[in-house]
């Protein structure tokens, strides 16, 4: 982003943005009290008079036009093959910035084995380039694979391209994501997640069914993307006819070009619209409160246009959604209502699709999203962006073997991507809930995942695909040797590797289950312990956000409601109790049951989806889903301990819990059913850092189980 000092590029002077006096149609809107530090308020129900969020208009960014998601009819209607519909869609395609580069791109792809395509989110590269390939002579046989870091992007892009091709989803165009494959023998354009293409490498090491591999959103540098980059570099040496296209929305193309030995770089010029950047004058002490106030300031004072708000996670999104709905009731009748639409990765697919539909009549749509909306998806109608400048980022401490998910500042590159969402279709505005000085302190780029997260899944993926030497793999950015060694140790602890570090039969079976290694190991152990159905239920609960709600204004009631589900042996069995009771309730009463028991219906829907998919996966492999009315808690906990042997801690004489790996002092999180209790040993699902090191998803175990489950590992550590 080019900085402009003193004046904006459009010639306007820098002015203080005092958008509203806090009054909406003569009524004073209420908002939560501010906190003293810059964090989301935990007590979002305490109300005080709204103060104005003052912004300084400083810079102008640019976005680009976009079509994905702009055809807002239902998916069924979008796939209708009427002549008028096809004509309208063709006109939309021709209006995309990339359309003019059609001939040049086709020639570049034809002439080069690897090219790097750089184009803003909205240029049309994700939808159009796969279709351009159909006209290339080399691409008349086989299929093109287009990878995406996120499932929602793979699904939405496939639906859009199917509409543009005038076919049903699953015919010429389809998608493949975890547990959901809509492709067929007719499919020639296949959207899939990075992880799914990595899975295909197990049975087809050279990906022979594809004439072209397109790695989209490569700039995000997810762990799976970096793994694919390394494998693709090996594959092109074995397949001279294969074409590879690396696509990025940011100007870091040289790194990708260098990795592929000087690959050609193609820059797609976007149709740019100005985006005015507004910073706060001073740091906001409570960014969630500031977002709420800014939403109403924009809604009451600025012209029509939808609002996109970047938040850090589901909890914040749902809290702000509830506040917006509550305070919207105070809006006068002459103003449009606000339609709040959440968007996060674990949101059920049909609810995610609501984001892409137009707002209801006499409503302004406010999309509350994680960083999923930075580049992976396109939402039409956005004119205003509110950016907290924060995201939840995984960090792994290889010395202690502990991974945490913490809220951290984003990079300048990510901030620019966020602001650009306001300028895809017309001039827009971005309101950053931080000062310009804070922006200048942000790192230029986001650190690649491979340098900061647990590498256990990556190492298992490599070894299952024949890459035994994980240190000398073709990494774009090599991970630390310490991180790789910790991953090898973890995989050895759960029985995936033999004494020489080679993958064994158990490890190979784990690699075939689309779960994290620890959870995959628990599923395999459950077959031996005759509790597969119960373990699948618990794994489903652990694979998304908590189903239990604790609204601040009814916290005591929520705690009381959860008592009926509590199990003396901890959180895993507590979750199982709640899920079982829900399934036993009548279909007609389930909505009321959730409300009475403070159960998050949205999370529960995701849990049930994962449960259904996991059960189908097991049945497909011929596994018996044995279950019994009386749960054998010991067998269930032993199954999980097989995958969580490194996530255990012993009670010490001073009353503290210390991990068996690293001797780290940890505390049981207050939300746990074991909070305040002392048991000889515990097993936990995750560790989070707040004021201290807390563990969640905690279960009580017996200390003598440790040697029974992993004697090979504990014996080796003691020598």
Swiss-Prot record:
Enzyme class at the top of the EC tree: hydrolase
EC number: 3.6.4.13
Keyword terms: ATP-binding, Helicase, Hydrolase, mRNA processing, Nucleotide-binding, RNA-binding
InterPro entries linked: DEAD-box_helicase_OB_fold (IPR011709), DEAD/DEAH_box_helicase_dom (IPR011545), DNA/RNA_helicase_DEAH_CS (IPR002464), HA2_WH (IPR048333), Helicase-assoc_dom (IPR007502), Helicase_ATP-bd (IPR014001), Helicase_C-like (IPR001650), P-loop_NTPase (IPR027417)
Ranges for domain Helicase ATP-binding: 106-269
Record-listed ATP binding positions: 119-126
GO cellular component, one term: spliceosomal complex
The keyword RNA-binding is assigned to this record: yes
Basic and acidic residues bias (residue ranges): 74-88
Compositionally biased tracts (Basic residues): 31-45
Ranges where the record places region Disordered: 1-48, 64-88
Gene3D superfamilies, per database record: 1.20.120.1080, P-loop containing nucleotide triphosphate hydrolases (3.40.50.300)
Sequence ranges assigned to domain Helicase C-terminal in this UniProt record: 294-466
Coiled coil (residue ranges): none
Family: Belongs to the DEAD box helicase family. DEAH subfamily.
Protein name per UniProt: Probable ATP-dependent RNA helicase prh1
């Amino acid at each position: 982003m080019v900085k402009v000092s003193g004046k904006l590029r459009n010639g306007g002077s820098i002015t203080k943005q005092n958008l509203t006096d806090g009054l909406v149609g003569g009524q004073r809107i209420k908002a939560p009290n501010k906190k003293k530090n810059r964090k989301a308020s935990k007590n979002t129900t305490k109300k005080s008079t709204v103060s104005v969020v003052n912004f300084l208009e400083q810079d102008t960014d640019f976005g680009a036009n976009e079509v994905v998601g702009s055809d807002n009819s239902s998916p069924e209607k979008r796939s209708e093959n009427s002549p008028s519909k096809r004509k309208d869609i063709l006109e939309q395609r021709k209006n995309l910035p990339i359309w003019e580069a059609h001939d040049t791109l086709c020639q570049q792809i034809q002439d080069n084995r690897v090219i790097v395509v750089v184009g803003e989110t909205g240029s049309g590269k994700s939808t159009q380039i796969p279709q351009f390939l159909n006209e290339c002579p080399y691409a008349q046989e086989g299929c093109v694979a287009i990878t995406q870091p996120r499932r929602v992007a793979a699904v939405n892009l496939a639906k859009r391209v199917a509409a543009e091709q005038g076919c049903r989803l699953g015919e010429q165009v389809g998608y493949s994501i975890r547990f959901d494959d809509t492709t067929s023998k007719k499919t020639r354009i296949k959207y899939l997640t990075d992880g799914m293409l990595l899975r295909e490498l197990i049975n087809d090491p050279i990906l022979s069914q594809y004439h072209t591999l397109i790695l989209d959103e490569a700039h995000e540098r997810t762990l799976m993307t970096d793994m694919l980059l390394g494998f693709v570099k090996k594959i092109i040496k074995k397949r001279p006819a294969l074409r590879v296209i690396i696509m990025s929305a940011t100007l870091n193309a040289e790194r990708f070009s260098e990795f592929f030995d000087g690959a050609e770089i193609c820059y797609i010029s976007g149709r740019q619209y100005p985006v005015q950047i507004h910073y706060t004058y001073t740091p906001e002490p409570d960014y969630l409160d500031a977002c709420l106030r800014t939403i109403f300031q924009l809604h009451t004072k600025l012209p029509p246009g939808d609002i996109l708000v970047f938040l850090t996670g589901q909890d914040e999104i749902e809290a702000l959604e509830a506040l917006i709905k509550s305070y919207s009731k105070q809006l006068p009748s002459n103003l449009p209502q606000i339609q709040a639409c959440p968007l996060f990765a674990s949101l059920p697919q049909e609810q995610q699709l609501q984001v892409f539909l137009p707002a209801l009549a006499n409503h302004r749509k406010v999309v509350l999203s994680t960083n999923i909306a930075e580049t992976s998806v396109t939402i039409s109608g956005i004119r205003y962006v509110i950016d907290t400048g924060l995201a939840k980022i995984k960090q792994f401490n290889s010395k202690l073997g502990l991974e945490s998910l913490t809220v951290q500042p984003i990079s300048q590159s990510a901030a620019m991507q966020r602001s650009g969402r306001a300028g895809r279709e017309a001039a827009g505005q971005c309101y950053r809930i931080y000062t310009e000085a804070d922006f200048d302190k942000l790192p230029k780029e986001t650190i690649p995942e491979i340098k900061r997260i647990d590498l256990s899944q990556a190492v298992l993926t490599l070894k299952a695909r024949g890459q035994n030497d994980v240190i000398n793999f073709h990494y774009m950015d090599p991970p630390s040797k310490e991180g790789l060694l910790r991953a090898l140790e973890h995989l050895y602890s759960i029985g995936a590797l033999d004494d020489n570090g080679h993958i064994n039969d158990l490890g190979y079976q784990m690699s075939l289950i689309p779960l994290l290694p620890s959870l995959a190991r628990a599923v395999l152990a459950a077959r031996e312990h005759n509790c597969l159905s119960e373990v699948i239920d618990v794994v489903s609960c652990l694979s998304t956000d908590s189903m239990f709600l604790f609204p601040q204004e009814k916290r005591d009631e929520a705690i009381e409601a959860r008592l009926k589900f509590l199990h003396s042996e901890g959180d895993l069995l507590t979750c199982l109790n709640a899920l079982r009771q829900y399934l036993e309730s009548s279909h007609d009463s389930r909505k009321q049951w959730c409300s009475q028991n403070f159960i998050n219906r949205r999370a529960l829907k995701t849990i049930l989806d994962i449960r259904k998919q996991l059960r189908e996966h097991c049945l497909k492999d011929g596994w018996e889903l044995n279950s019994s009315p009386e749960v054998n808690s010991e067998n269930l906990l032993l199954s999980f301990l097989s995958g969580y042997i490194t996530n255990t801690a012993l009670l010490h004489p001073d009353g503290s819990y210390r991990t068996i790996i690293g001797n780290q002092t940890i505390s049981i999180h207050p939300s746990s059913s074991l909070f305040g209790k002392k048991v000889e040993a515990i097993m936990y699902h995750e560790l989070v850092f707040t004021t201290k090191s807390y563990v969640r998803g905690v279960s009580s175990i017996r200390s003598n189980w440790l040697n029974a489950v992993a004697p090979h590992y504990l014996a080796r550590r003691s020598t």
